[in-house]
Curated annotation (Swiss-Prot):
Listed name of the protein: Insulin-related peptide 2
Tissue: DAGWWVPPQSARALGGGR-amide: Expressed in corpora cardiaca (CC), corpora allata (CA), antennal lobe (AL) and gnathal ganglion (GNG) (at protein level). Expression in CC and CA detected in most animals, in AL in some animals and in GNG in few animals (at protein level).
Secretion signal span: 1-19
Regions annotated as coiled coil: none
Modified residues (Arginine amide): 63
Length: 86
């Protein structure tokens, strides 16, 4: 168990170092592994309140139908951008 925690911390440090270097391309297996690493332990969005569908659509804006592949494989992205997909 301790091995997995240490391994996760090492990977997190590696991700932090790569984010300091700027942006990178993440595609395929590398994208899924990096997302899993970045999102590991991240808190899920609050589901404690409910918004009617009409109001939710009005609040949407933002990303539209773009996903992590559009953001990180077709153009470079940072770890901070990847965190928005957790």
């Amino acid at each position: 168990m301790k091995f997995y925690i240490v391994f996760a911390l090492i990977l997190a440090c590696a991700a932090c170092v790569s984010s300091q270097e700027g942006t990178n391309f993440y595609c395929g297996r590398q994208l899924s592994r990096t997302l899993a690493l970045v999102c590991w332990g991240a808190e899920k969005r609050d589901a404690g309140w409910w918004v009617p569908p009409q109001s939710a659509r009005a609040l949407g804006g933002g990303r539209g139908k773009r996903g992590p592949v559009d953001e990180c494989c077709l153009k470079p992205c940072s770890i901070e951008e990847m965190l928005t997909y957790c």
